[in-house]
Amino acid sequence: MIRWFKCFMRMIFEQVGLNMESVLWSSKPYGSSRSIVRKIGTNLSLIQCPRVQFQLTSQAAEGNHPHQFREDAVASFADVGWVAQEEGEVSTRLRSEVWSKTAQPLPGELHQPGHSLGRQDSVPNLLHEEPAPRSTVIANEEAMQKISALENELATLRAQIAKIVILQEQQNLTAAGLSPVASAAVPCVPPPPPPPPPPPLPPPALQQSMSAIELIRERKNRKTNSGPIPTENGPKKPEIPNMLEILKDMNSVKLRSVKKSSGDTKPKVADPTDPAALIAEALKKKFAYRYRRDSQSESDKVIPKSETNTKTEVVLFGPHMLKSTGKMKTLIEKS
């Protein structure tokens, strides 16, 4: 099998024009990457296909030289995905193929940028757009008329609001004391007078030395010296109580105990149908029983047996029915 393979390889190399020994065992002039397949391919008389070369060209250069790459054009990245529409067929072609079919312009004609390049023919021309239709122009005019009408309505509304505000201010002034005749005669409301200047502040030394209580006393003395102030016909406004005056003599107040005799106070006759009296009586009984029970636990008073024996009611159920086991006595003795 190996001998047959060797013979087959020799026959192939002889037909190509190579010696098998020189191919396999001779030195490699092309380096270690040179293979037998490459050597066979270089010796065969095959037509080599042209390699694709890409060249980047600017749009300005294309516009300046419209007939430069028509004969032997080199493909560029601009041709990738470029679609030419011709004779109802859509296909991807190079610009050179389309230019060869189009008629070449005369040298005397002016260069038109919209029709110089096939690529510009395929791209929609945004500079030379069609004029807007008449219907859109009419619609724009109608919209402008509506906007102007709305602006006029807004202006009238503003004027009405201003009149209403002026009337309200005039009514407020008449209620404050002005006569309605004078307010009706004046078309515009006069500006309000400037506020009176604030009273001069006392010197800082007096403010620091005088306390709040002293100020209150001085004001009281001034009121008493000036005499009674004539009261107005209108209702008198209630004065706001001052807490400093109320709490001023709190430490000097002493309470006195008063003893009341039992004959002075007469018990009120309670109405049996009054719900408030019934609730008060029930609460008195409840809290009296609780107070009595707490006082008994505090004083550790022993209830005499005579009181318990006088009870007529017989308790059916209770702790007296339990049998004594003696555990309570042991617990009491231990404690």
Curated annotation (Swiss-Prot):
Residues 182-309 are annotated as: Necessary and sufficient to promote mitochondrial fission. Residues 1-48 form a transit peptide. Keywords: Coiled coil, Mitochondrion, Transit peptide. One of its GO terms (biological process) is mitochondrion organization. Residues 134-170 form a coiled coil. It is found in: Mitochondrion. One of its GO terms (cellular component) is mitochondrion. Widely expressed in embryonic tissues with higher expression in cartilage and hypertrophic chondrocytes. Specifically expressed in hypertrophic chondrocytes (at protein level). Its main location: mitochondrion. Residues 219-240 are annotated as: Disordered. Belongs to the MTFR1 family. PANTHER family: MITOCHONDRIAL FISSION REGULATOR 1, PROTEIN OF UNKNOWN FUNCTION DUF729. May play a role in mitochondrial aerobic respiration. May also regulate mitochondrial organization and fission. This is Mitochondrial fission regulator 1.
